[in-house]
Amino acid sequence: MPKNFKKHLPLKKYGQNFLINKDTIKNIIKIIDPKTTETLVEIGPGLAALTKPMCELLEELIVIEIDQDLLFLLKKRSFYSKLIVFYQNALNFNFLNLFHKKKQLIRIFGNLPYNISTSLIIFLFKQIKVIQDMNFMLQKEVAERLISTPGNKSYGRLSIISQYYCDIKILLNVSPEDFRPIPKVHSVFINLKPHTNSPYFVYNVNILSAITKDAFQNRRKILRHSLKNLFSEKELIKLEINSNLRAENVSVSHYCKLANYLYKKSNNLLKIN
């Protein structure tokens, strides 16, 4: 157990569970495989379980931390001079500005707090054009939602939006015993890599988001009912989408097809008016 653990009580409001297993830490560093020429950002360095070994391989590491007590402990570490520290909520961080400053894509990693992991990933998708890849420790249940496919209970809006933006892989299963305090859930370490040649295309991702919101608000309803305010049954037939399917049985590509149809339909209506 890290010496600093006794000096800092994990705060529930920040969802803090600190990684302590040395073998797991080594495996994660190996997975990330950092290069000195890259711009790397760690979200939530905590007690520096990943920060310290990363600094041994890098000349500079950017960290974002919201807990002032943890920053105070971090300042006492021998590798602190290698850090560029941002004391703020990662949900407010401007990665676009960092990209313009560094003039290269950004690699982001971290042991994400369970209470903000989903919100943070959605936030990062909005800045995806400046991100090279993301490597995160997540609650296993959240990771399963990210990679889930049609027909599974875990398949939903998060699955569709995540797979639209990224290729996602679970790389490591992590036991609750690897953390302090010990969480009640299992974790996994995952990689999210923005598509180089995306299998999906939409004119407007906000329309895709709106359609999936309507569909999954009533996930047990069939499409012709859950999406009746957006599409007629004739339109669904025209798009070769089975109107008797439930939201959880519709593929990402079909949701993209719906989004593009609605985009064109809306534009045509604007031209008429």
UniProtKB/Swiss-Prot annotation:
InterPro entries: KsgA/Erm (IPR001737), rRNA_Ade_diMease-like_C (IPR023165), rRNA_Ade_Mease_Trfase_CS (IPR020596), rRNA_Ade_methylase_Trfase_N (IPR020598), rRNA_adenine_dimethylase (IPR011530), SAM-dependent_MTases_sf (IPR029063). PROSITE patterns: RRNA_A_DIMETH (PS01131), SAM_RNA_A_N6_MT (PS51689). Pfam families: RrnaAD. One of its GO terms (molecular function) is RNA binding. Its EC number is 2.1.1.182. GO terms for cellular component: cytosol. It catalyses: adenosine(1518)/adenosine(1519) in 16S rRNA + 4 S-adenosyl-L-methionine = N(6)-dimethyladenosine(1518)/N(6)-dimethyladenosine(1519) in 16S rRNA + 4 S-adenosyl-L-homocysteine + 4 H(+). It is found in: Cytoplasm. It is an enzyme of class 2 (transferase). The keyword Glycoprotein does not apply. Transmembrane segments: none annotated. Keywords: Cytoplasm, Methyltransferase, RNA-binding, rRNA processing, S-adenosyl-L-methionine, Transferase. S-adenosyl-L-methionine binds at N17, L19, G44, E65, N111. PANTHER family: DIMETHYLADENOSINE TRANSFERASE (PTHR11727), DIMETHYLADENOSINE TRANSFERASE-RELATED (PTHR11727:SF7). NCBIfam families: ksgA. Specifically dimethylates two adjacent adenosines (A1518 and A1519) in the loop of a conserved hairpin near the 3'-end of 16S rRNA in the 30S particle. May play a critical role in biogenesis of 30S subunits. Belongs to the class I-like SAM-binding methyltransferase superfamily. rRNA adenine N(6)-methyltransferase family. RsmA subfamily. HAMAP family: 16SrRNA_methyltr_A (MF_00607). This is Ribosomal RNA small subunit methyltransferase A. It comes from Buchnera aphidicola subsp. Acyrthosiphon pisum (strain APS) (Acyrthosiphon pisum symbiotic bacterium).
